Amino acid sequence: EGKLWDKSADGSNSSQFLKPFRDHGVDLPDGALPPADPKILLNHMDQSKVWSSVIFASVRKWNVSDPELLFSVYRAFNDYAMEVNKIDPDRIFLLPALPTRHPEECLKELARMIKAGAKAVEFPPFDVAKPVYDEVWEPLWAMASEARVPLCIHIGGAADAPLPPYHRGAQIAFLATAPFNLCNTFAQLVFCGAFERHPNLKVLFSECRIGWVPFAIEWCDRQVEERAPDPSAPLSMLPSEYAKRNCGFTFEEDYVGTEMM
């Protein structure tokens, strides 16, 4: 009964966050940081009756202005993630993250993670140096496709963009429409031909719910049927076919979406 998390919590080490754990019998030593401690996390998952978890971190939101230091931060975090993933690989997978503001470094880090045995990586589209339809990303799509390492994308916004104010409904409106902000990324990947050129490229759109997905796919198909093809990015299939072959969408508590799919 009840939940083991508190949506009003303001941090993983705050008393407000830790109280729900302790109330449900999870043993937490003083100073424990549950998301960063795999043993505590597994205990939490057992209490919640969750078998496995794919975990997104927030590396992209860390404000590091020096590029070389930033790259070191990403490498250190990703090395840590791969260590965590050895503890119980059937149940915990902490996604290594790519520094998408720096495409060349992004490619290097993807290559390093593939060599380290990563099953998937996080690709945040909100902080990219160039839009995902730009040619600068072609080497990344090719590498991920060849290695068959999925790129995982989470809903959100630009790291340096603050939430709208909690005033006159602005923040609630932003949060209410957050699941839809991956629709543009999906459409750009389809229409730039990334999936056409790289048939084994897999992209997972995470925690975005799925109620919008059938409409978005149908509307993308209609563009192909009603508009002149773009000669710079020819497609041999409908967007709905690329969606089925190359994409996945995860959700929670989406009754409408489950009925439509």
State the predicted function of each range.
Residues E1-M261:
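Helix-coil boundary/capping segments in enzymes
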